[in-house]
């Protein structure tokens, strides 16, 4: 193969790799930090709505809570169980807690 052919092949492979990377749908994220309340429920609902509208492949929730209202916690659990996309909850960063989760 000539140098020109090798260079052209390299550029084609690079373009294909970049195209494949940009084609993947995004992963949405939301951070919940504090007491679980009706405001937290609304935050989760908005994050799910946005993630689904953006055609995200998943929603990642970063959670750090001492707990909160049982009614809000149960409503959040129902929303997550009925979500149209996968939801991943990460208790973090290190030292974080999830008392009502």
Regions found by a protein language model. Give the residues of each.
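Soluble extramembrane regions of membrane proteins in the secretory/endomembrane system
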Residues: 18-101
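Bacterial N-terminal signal peptides
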Residues: 5-19
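N-terminal secretory signal peptides that target proteins for export/translocation
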Residues: 1-2
